[in-house]
Amino acid sequence: MENFLLALNVVLPIFFIMTLGFLLKKIKMADEHSLNIMNKLVFRVFMSTLLFLNVYNIGDLSALSMDNLKLLGYAFIIILVVLFIAWLIYMPKVKDKRKLSVLIQGVYRGNFVLFGLAIVDSIYGKEGLATVSLLTIVVIPTFNVLAVIILEYYSGREISKLKLLKQVIKNPLIIATLLGIIFIILKINIPKPIYKTLSDISKIATPLAFIVLGAELEFGNMVKNIKYLISANILRLIGNPLITVGVGKLVGFQGIELVALLSMSACPTAVASYTMAKEMNADGDLAGEIVATTSMLSIFTIFCWVLMLKNLEWI
């Protein structure tokens, strides 16, 4: 019963906030224009500030233990493994390259910052957030760099290495991560008033992002892509965490480390994947539908994963 309640405590706040967003859209307190603006604010300002502070709060990279480095190395490798498996599955069957890139991205690229922080905070509190913040140093740049490469490669346009580099460098989450690392390496201390301001701004990120995500959920036009959506949801919400957490346990990770890996792999497809797909000539409609369906279904699957791992005493 205790494990059941813990799992509920993880997913219910996410569900309630997303439901609020959905209702606000229905009663016309938010429209497409305002949601687009809020989405940009979340992505470029609030989420980036949150990510910067989480990295900055690590404090000292020289204090990283071998276990920390092992976790970072594993996260990087397993992302590549999941991406390769998704490519092997979809490459022979999906002839439309614009859909192929979106499906691959939908499987490996999760909404790690948003859902990951919420999941780990619910289970382990600040102690767990330190581990997730550490993972962001590797996970966020890897997610985004690979997304730019895949979407550009399958866009049907001539590939420019300079354009690829620009797409990577301009990503707000990558910039925030790198800034956090630079502040740590140079031992730059942020004055208390500025830190307090940044901290207050960062607290807006998670609830507002969930409100926007809930408001943007649309299920009316998904029939034409139903077979792609079913496979993407199974691979994203079941296959990815099964591989990532299962192999992670075999490698020797446990407790907070496994929860961090679960939050990386079991969360829904990143909201930014929709924006990036539209900007890079991929199938934006399919990308948005994958984000919407995985976001809704993940409420149930994350609950099941947390409950199962708790009962197995892995976390």
Located regions from the model:
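Alpha-helical transmembrane segments of multi-pass small-molecule/ion transporters
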Residues: 1-315
